[in-house]
A protein has these predicted regions:
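Conserved PLP-binding active-site segment of the aspartate aminotransferase-like
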Residues: 34-40, 278, 316-325, 341-374
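Conserved N-terminal alpha-helix of the aminotransferase class I/II PLP-enzyme fold
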Residues: 49, 53-98
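Active-site phosphate-binding strand-loop segment of PLP-dependent enzymes
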Residues: 139, 143-198
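PLP-dependent enzyme catalytic core of the Aspartate aminotransferase-like
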Residues: 45, 49-53, 86, 337-338, ...
């Protein structure tokens, strides 16, 4: 076997020296406070059983057998996409293999040469990778800073009157758990005739009536150019969809390379998406319990005097900033020794100095578990920070 080139060896060595070397670990035992399975749908027997019933309606193979433009466009896709469009109150939905594929597929294909993309500086890596593949010019604005966004819009609107301008943000940010003021953002977008693209990955299933997302909670559907909803988090399955006009769907089918040049999701994966949405549509208990647990977690933050190191968030993502890769890894190790699965988020995933513990709250976390993990954290902070 050939050796890894020396340049790559050096990059790996740098990661080790910076204490940011990543490894794959087995799924650990203990209380889950680190997965994105906010509603517990990944373990739902009802969703699994209904998936089998959906598959039995069709003569379906184990795999999709090809891309959707060839042999992979099974009838279950049409059913699921119609269901998604109806649930999310939009003209059309197009399923992609993952949220990553959806974002690189959208941003590499839709914005054109000389167009402008203004994106929140904390936008997900999949958005940033899509921007790298785009012919459009892209510029970041300060996190959730709408004044900075408007200043950039003024400048680029004056300099590029014939170009489309896209504003890109997330409804719930994956690392901080916070949200932008979407109402004001869309007022600004309308003022400058800009097109808004909202990634709803961490709002899907969690925010709004029946988890329809932040955009629908605020009744802003008609003001959005495109929404990206993903299914690997609260929905407990896999895949993603881009929501928008019928013409946008047609355009993506014709020009989005991550859609065109890949084997389609398996019919089982698509049936699971459909099954999870059927369950979500009638489910209120799981979302109610999740909201209660989030509020209890926030109350316990206050009770343990930890509010100064937590980022304010009403979402299922609660981030505790402990600066430094080594220190935050030590904090995570201490918590894990007590039987709680909480993962450190290291730089360069987040900027140096903003390393954090990322707590993910679920319907199945008990009040006792929440109280105990924050006591363990409080003891670590008292003795080490």
């Amino acid at each position: 076997m050939k050796k890894l080139p020396s340049k790559l060896e050096k990059r790996l060595q740098r990661r080790k020296e910076e204490d940011s070397f990543r490894i794959l670990l087995s799924f650990p035992e203990g209380v889950d406070l680190f997965s994105n399975d906010y509603l517990g749908y990944s373990r739902s027997k009802e969703i699994a059983e209904n998936t089998v019933r959906i598959l039995k309606q069709y003569d379906i193979t184990n795999g999709s057998t090809g891309s959707r433009l060839l042999s992979g466009n099974h009838p279950v896709f049409k059913e699921a996409e119609n269901q998604l469009a109806s649930f999310h109150n939009t003209q059309s939905a197009l399923i992609f293999n993952s949220g990553y594929d959806a974002n690189i597929g959208f941003f590499s294909a839709v914005p054109q040469k000389n167009d402008i993309i203004l994106y929140d500086e904390y936008a997900h890596a999949s958005i940033r990778d899509g921007l790298k593949m785009s012919l459009a010019r892209n510029y970041k604005f300060q996190h959730n800073d709408l004044q900075d966004l408007e200043e950039k819009l003024k400048r680029f609107k004056a300099d590029s009157s014939d170009s489309e301008i896209y504003i890109v943000t997330e409804s719930v940010f994956s690392m901080d758990g916070d949200s932008p003021d979407l109402i004001q953002l869309l007022e600004i977008a309308e003022k400058y005739a800009a097109l808004a693209v909202i990634d709803e990955a961490h709002a899907t299933g969690v925010i709004g009536d029946h988890g329809k997302g932040m955009v629908q909670k605020l009744q802003l559907e008609s003001k959005i150019f495109a929404r990206i909803h993903t299914f690997g988090k609260a929905m407990g399955c896999h895949g993603a969809a881009i929501l928008g006009s019928r013409n946008l769907k047609d355009y993506l089918i014709n020009f989005s390379r991550s859609f065109i040049y890949t084997t389609a999701l398996s019919p089982h994966s698509v049936a699971t998406i459909s099954s999870a949405y059927r369950f979500l549509e009638k489910d209120s208990a799981h979302l109610k319990k999740l909201k209660e647990n989030i509020q209890f977690f926030k109350t316990e933050i206050q009770n343990n005097g930890l509010q100064d190191i937590f980022i304010e968030s009403d979402s299922a993502i609660q981030a505790c900033v402990i600066s430094g890769n080594t220190k935050v890894k030590n904090a995570a190790a201490e918590i894990q020794k007590s039987g709680f699965n909480v993962k450190p988020i290291l730089s360069p995933t987040v900027p140096s100095g903003s390393e954090r513990l990322r707590f993910c709250i679920h319907t199945y976390n008990s009040s006792h578990e929440i109280s105990q993990v924050l006591k363990v954290l409080g003891n670590f902070v008292a003795n080490n920070i």
